[in-house]
Amino acid sequence: MYTLHYICLVLSCVIYFVWTLSCPTRNQYVSVKYVNLTNYSGPYPNGTTLHVTCREGYAKRPVQTVTCVNGNWTVPKKCQKKKCSTPQDLLNGRYTVTGNLYYGSVITYTCNSGYSLIGSTTSACLLKRGGRVDWTPRPPICDIKKCKPPPQIANGTHTNVKDFYTYLDTVTYSCNDETKLTLTGPSSKLCSETGSWVPNGETKCEFIFCKLPQVANAYVEVRKSATSMQYLHINVKCYKGFMLYGETPNTCNHGVWSPAIPECMKISSPKGDMPGINSNEDNSTPSGRICNGNCTTSMPTQTYTIITARYTSHIYFPTGKTYKLPRGVLVIILTTSFIIIGIILTGVCLHRCRVCMSGQ
């Protein structure tokens, strides 16, 4: 057999002594991407058929062949990239894909706030054993953030006691004896997304003391607890000629006096009746009787604010009716409709009605 080389074509003399065109060797076959020819070294006379295989990561369905026809190979279809399966949802996280899931694509994983990523942050669609493709490495896990046990406090405790704490767990602090101790600092703490307790700041149970008040025109009796100044009690005693305005005894409650410290106001009985009200008093009336406030017919019907040593209330005075005032009670009538002789505080005129006290 003889071979004739002419330009780029190869002629072969076959058994019938006829010159025919041959196809290029497979290493010259580069017109189709990602294609490998079967291991056949040639020559490739007219009619030769070779199986076509795709490179790694590419596939062709069905399996195809190429044939030498008049010096040219038939053109196969292109090999397509293999495709990985759609990733499963990442519990407590999310992912993004570049490459549309095909061979060579990459997934990037991130976890939601309050969760830690355990594993690789990325996976790639790579070739596996047997020619298949799959995501490598396996997807990570998003594990909830954990906090160390919350700080303990002296003379106090917290709620939600358990072996371990996770993101969004909350504890609330309280003092063992809330009548003596005051909670300072954050009363509640939260296990945050960083695995630390917030807000910052130390929580304590402390004894908070009250300052001994200075009351004008009075002296203060002190009764101190044997265990703590937190249980400090006082009684305010007005000097002669002054009357208590407010309430006593008073207790130091978490640094605040309760009820509020009273005042001692000078006793005065202005002569004459209050406009619209007749103050009827009989100085010879024995102690224990009552004073009558008698509303005259000339006074328009209206409501006054009555403040006594023990309460504050609104009293309605209907025309022609009598309002009886308990003995021993200082009554202050506030009004802005007319001026009354008395004490002016913050623009409000105060008038003390005369009171039956020990016949005086």
UniProtKB/Swiss-Prot annotation:
Glycan-bearing residues: N36, N39, N46, N72, N155, N294
Cystine bridges: C23-C68, C54-C79, C84-C125, C111-C142, C147-C191, C175-C205, C210-C252, C238-C264
Taxonomic superkingdom: Viruses
GO biological process, one term: negative regulation of complement activation
Signal peptide: 1-20
Keyword Glycoprotein assigned: yes
GO cellular component: extracellular region; membrane
Coiled coil (UniProt feature): none
Alphabetized GO MF terms: complement binding
Family classification: Belongs to the receptors of complement activation (RCA) family.
Name of this chain's protein: Complement control protein homolog
Source organism of this protein record: Saimiriine herpesvirus 2 (strain 11)
